[in-house]
Amino acid sequence: MRLIVTKNYEEMSKVAAKEMAEDIKRNPEIVLGLATGGTPVGMYKELIRMYNEGELDFSKVTSINLDEYVGLSGDHDQSYRYFMNTNLFDHINIDKNNTFVPNGLAENVEEECMAYDARIQDIGGIDLQLLGLGANGHIGFNEPGEALSVGTNLTDLKESTIEANARFFDSIDDVPRKAITMGLGGIMKAKKIMVIASGEGKAEVVKAMMSGKITTEIPATMLQMHRDVILIVDEDAAKLLK
C-alpha cells in the first residue's frame, strides 16, 4: 500500500485527480470505479478543470459507481446518479450511456444486484477503483458486521452512516435506510484501488486501514490484502500514523 500525505484537502484533491488523469491518459478506454460523498468533490472539480484545459479526454471512458440509495430516482437531488451528473458527468465529454449507477427504484433488487455484477464482468472489470472512507470504516456501503458480502447487495445502513449523511438532506428522517452497494468482492477485483480521506474524523480509520487487524468490523482493513492500493490523505487524516 502506497501512502501519500498532503497538506490539506485541496492538495489531496489535486494529487488524487492527477493520479487518475495519468491512468486515463495511459488507457483512454479505462473502466473507472467512482465514489460519491463529500470527499471526492474537489477531485472531480480538478478533473473538470483538466478537461476544460484540454488535458483529458473522457470520450472512451466507462464508469461504474459503487452504490445508490434504495427508493430514490436518478433525478432526485440526493441520489448518487444525480450527484455524479452534477459533480462530474455534465461537465466532461463522457458518454452517459457508458456511466453506470445501481437503479435505486428497481422492482426486484436481487435481480438488479446480479445484473450489476454481470455488467462489471461484461465490460472487463474495473481498472481503477476510487474509494472514500466512512468514519466507521465502511467502503461503498459495506458496513461493519460479522460478515461482508462478496457481490453487489442490498444493505441496511448503520445509524452512524445515516447520521453522517443527514447533512445532505432536509431532515435525518429523509435519509434512506437501505442502499444497493457493490460488494467487497467486486471492489477487491479492481486492478488498482485509490483511497482518499480528509480530516481528523477519518484519522482512526486511516490508521486501522494501514496497520490495524484485518476484520469485517472495519471493512477498510480488507484493503490490506489488495496488491495495488494508493492511499492519499491530508495531514489531519494522517495524524495518527507514525
Swiss-Prot record:
The active site is at D67, N136, H138, E143. GO terms for biological process: carbohydrate metabolic process; glucosamine catabolic process; N-acetylglucosamine catabolic process; N-acetylneuraminate catabolic process. Keywords: Carbohydrate metabolism, Hydrolase. It holds the Pfam family Glucosamine_iso. One of its GO terms (molecular function) is identical protein binding. The keyword Hydrolase applies. Its EC number is 3.5.99.6. The keyword Hydrolase applies. GO terms for cellular component: cytoplasm. Pathway: Amino-sugar metabolism; N-acetylneuraminate degradation; D-fructose 6-phosphate from N-acetylneuraminate: step 5/5. PROSITE patterns: GLC_GALNAC_ISOMERASE. Gene3D superfamilies: 3.40.50.1360. It catalyses: alpha-D-glucosamine 6-phosphate + H2O = beta-D-fructose 6-phosphate + NH4(+). InterPro entries: Glc/Gal-6P_isomerase, Glucosamine6P_isomerase, Glucosamine6P_isomerase_CS, NagB/RpiA_transferase-like. It is an enzyme of class 3 (hydrolase). Belongs to the glucosamine/galactosamine-6-phosphate isomerase family. NagB subfamily. NCBIfam families: nagB. Catalyzes the reversible isomerization-deamination of glucosamine 6-phosphate (GlcN6P) to form fructose 6-phosphate (Fru6P) and ammonium ion. HAMAP family: GlcN6P_deamin (MF_01241). This is Glucosamine-6-phosphate deaminase. It comes from Clostridium perfringens (strain SM101 / Type A).
